[in-house]
Amino acid sequence: MPFFSTRDQNRKVTSSQAIAQGLSDEGGLFVPESFPQVDVKALCGLDYPALAAAVVREYLTDYDPAFLTDATRSTYGAAFGGKAGYLALVEGDTYALELWHGPTCAFKDYALQLMPKLLVEAKKNLGRTEKTLILVATSGDTGKAALDGYHDIPGVEIAVFYPTGGTSEIQRLQMATQEGANVAV
């Protein structure tokens, strides 16, 4: 599926190009050309990794579907304790979607654990071998989730910035103690 820039709808790129580039040349965001129609009934009963694979396959059409299945299965498996996308019964017919079962207990783990795999595959799809630097500015959970997702990913370096006194002490320590040869805080 083509993606276009929010600042130039005439410039279309593949999903691999959008993921590898991050922002468009004009400084815009890449958005999908359309939103696929999905058969919701066909998705019912799927576990979270299979559901995620079914959805991302609709958007990342230049990726190998088998890769996407493997990537979502490995991402949302053990690191999420088997509870990715877990619906907890509150009472009666009321449920709560628990988004804290990822490795950093932040909802951002859902994106930031899968994205590094998608970036590495995008670079492979495009034949790109240069290093990629991910820059993150945060005042909270994003920093730790990004550091955890991208740590020790080949060909990628990540640097996280946060304002002095702008995070809780726990968040600062989570970021400052992140292991990985390619991380900087």
Provide a role label for each language-model segment.
Residues 1-185:
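PLP-dependent amino-acid enzyme catalytic core
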